[in-house]
Amino acid sequence: MEALATHRHARTSAQKARLVADQIRGLHVEKALELLAYSPKKSADLIKKVLESAIANAEHNEGADIDELTVSKVFVDEGPTMKRIKPRAKGRADRIFKRSSHITVVVADN
């Protein structure tokens, strides 16, 4: 059985979050949580929260045993981009892109 959790509009770029997501794909959930706890990246904290939510969903909704769960799928899609203006010298302006992403974690027992 599978349990899913998502975090939509996470304030990190999808490219940066995918670096962390690729590290935990296919791991046992305890090993994945340990790896995320010691990762220095901001997106590791976001993915850790989503993983904990997916584990709780599996336990509560599906009645799954936590000791048998693995991270079956992790994917990070691009969310909406906020566009901002940064004033520059001589009346010019640069665009700033504040990117967001949608993080999805699926856990399953073997």
From Swiss-Prot:
Keyword Cell inner membrane tagged: no
A GO molecular-function annotation: rRNA binding
SUPFAM superfamilies, per database record: Ribosomal protein L22
Keywords: Ribonucleoprotein, Ribosomal protein, RNA-binding, rRNA-binding
Swiss-Prot/TrEMBL GO biological process terms: translation
Highest rank taxon of the organism: Bacteria
Any single Pfam family the record assigns to this protein: Ribosomal_L22
PANTHER family linked: CHLOROPLAST 50S RIBOSOMAL PROTEIN L22-RELATED, LARGE RIBOSOMAL SUBUNIT PROTEIN UL22M
Protein's UniProt name: Large ribosomal subunit protein uL22
